[in-house]
Structures are given as structure tokens and as C-alpha cells.
């Protein structure tokens, strides 16, 4: 039972760290070019370390980029699917939470996405 609890804590920490990094990236966009360049390397380093540490603990963070075609077979929950007709072609507008998998590829936590029309 304690192992499951620790796994849940680690998964939640991964998700919140990923969210923090995405927010940091949005803040970087507001900086002038010189300042942005100065801090962008830190974000790259942070994301690399997050992925490395997740892998060491047996986890993988999976995300989809904005503009990727949406498929109902993706391991994600949609927050606005009810806004579209079933036959509409959709793409991911924003990834709100990443997918967390174990090293065997089993989904431990589904991601969350916001969709838009293609």
C-alpha cells in the first residue's frame, strides 16, 4: 500500500512540475529576446532533468504538441469534446496535463487536452 501511495505522490509531482515548466515557458515568451535566451536554457535543463529523474524512477512523461490531430484512442481526457460534432476533424489546442506511463508503456495517468477544429 505504501508503494502505491509513493507512486501516486511521484506521479502528482511529475504532473505539477510539468505544469510549472509550461507556465515558465509562457512567461519566457513575454520577455525581450536577450532575457528570453538567458532563461530558456534553464527551462531546457529543467525539462531534461525532469525526464531523466522520471525515467530513473520507472516513469515516462508523454505529451502531444498543439496542432497534432486528435484521435479518440489517445490516452487523454478532453475538457471540451461536447463543443464539437462527432464527425468534425479535431486537433489538440493545448495539453493541460501530460500522460504518465511506466517503463513498460502502461498508462498510469491519462493526460488532459483542450481541442479545436482542424
Language-model features, listed with the residues they occupy:
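Extended, amphipathic alpha-helical stalk segments that mediate dimerization
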Residues: 1-37, 45-118
Amino acid at each position: 500500500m505504501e508503494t502505491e501511495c509513493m507512486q501516486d505522490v511521484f506521479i502528482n509531482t511529475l504532473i505539477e512540475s510539468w505544469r510549472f515548466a509550461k507556465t515558465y515557458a509562457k512567461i519566457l515568451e513575454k520577455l525581450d529576446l536577450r532575457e528570453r535566451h538567458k532563461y530558456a536554457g534553464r527551462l531546457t535543463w529543467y525539462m531534461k532533468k525532469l525526464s531523466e529523474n522520471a525515467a530513473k524512477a520507472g516513469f515516462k512523461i508523454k505529451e502531444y504538441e498543439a496542432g497534432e490531430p486528435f484521435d479518440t484512442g489517445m490516452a487523454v481526457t478532453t475538457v471540451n469534446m461536447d463543443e464539437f460534432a462527432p464527425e468534425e476533424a479535431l486537433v489538440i489546442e493545448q495539453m493541460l496535463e501530460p500522460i504518465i506511463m511506466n517503463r513498460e508503456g502502461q498508462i498510469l495517468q491519462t493526460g488532459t487536452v483542450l481541442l479545436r477544429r482542424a
